[in-house]
């Protein structure tokens, strides 16, 4: 099962997959962290696409996802999802984070994408504890792919060594069950 899930230490903006996931803010207008990096690398086309989505449906609430073209990125599309802001764990954060991953996967599936790359959603300025967020990510994706043939390849693209090791350890433990 886990042969479809991979961990990469690197820059998500350089990964050549069908879709990359952007840990966006509700405005979809770019920001800090991975969101800002994706917007900078994609160029003005991405901001224009996000503005079109905003005009059509307004902001993207936590747990939801929308899809746009990828601009100058090597990916075909960007799936923008909004993870929850960590507020101590008593405000439905786990469910919202699960939904962010699940809705991103469903958009990839609906668009026929066979490969998708995820950052560690909500673990930057949104403050979600890394280990808890990684467990939700791995469990959500593993459960999704056990029932579906697509996407064929899923990548967790981790910006730092500590997060990379965390995802590798979780996937190894899951493979042992």
Swiss-Prot record:
Write the record's keywords in alphabetical order, separated by commas. Hydrolase
EC number(s) per entry? 3.1.1.106
Q: Which InterPro entries match?
A: Macro_dom, Macro_dom-like, O-Ac-ADP-ribose_deAcase
| Molecular functions (GO terms) | O-acetyl-ADP-ribose deacetylase activity; purine nucleoside binding; ribonuclease inhibitor activity
Question: Where does this protein hold substrate?
Answer: 11-12, 25, 33-35, 122-126
Q: Which family does it belong to?
A: Belongs to the MacroD-type family. YmdB subfamily.
- What is the purpose of this protein? Deacetylates O-acetyl-ADP ribose to yield ADP-ribose and free acetate. Down-regulates ribonuclease 3 (RNase III) activity. Acts by interacting directly with the region of the ribonuclease that is required for dimerization/activation.
Descriptive protein name: O-acetyl-ADP-ribose deacetylase
């Amino acid at each position: 099962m886990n042969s479809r899930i991979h961990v990469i230490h690197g820059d998500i903006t350089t990964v050549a997959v069908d879709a990359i996931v952007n840990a966006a803010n509700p405005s979809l207008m770019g920001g800090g962290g991975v969101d800002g990096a994706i917007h900078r690398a994609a160029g003005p086309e991405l901001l224009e696409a996000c503005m079109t989505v905003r005009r059509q449906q307004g902001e993207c609430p936590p747990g939801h996802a929308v899809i746009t073209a990828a601009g100058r990125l090597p990916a075909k599309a960007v799936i923008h999802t909004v993870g929850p802001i960590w507020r101590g764990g008593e405000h439905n954060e786990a469910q919202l984070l699960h939904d962010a991953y699940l809705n991103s996967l469903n958009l990839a599936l609906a668009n026929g994408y066979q490969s998708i790359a995820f950052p560690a959603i909500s673990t930057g300025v949104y403050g979600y504890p890394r280990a808890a967020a990684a467990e939700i990510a791995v469990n959500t994706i593993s459960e999704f792919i056990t029932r579906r043939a697509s996407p064929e390849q899923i990548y967790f693209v981790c910006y730092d060594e500590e997060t990379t090791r965390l995802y590798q350890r979780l996937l190894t433990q899951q493979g042992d069950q």
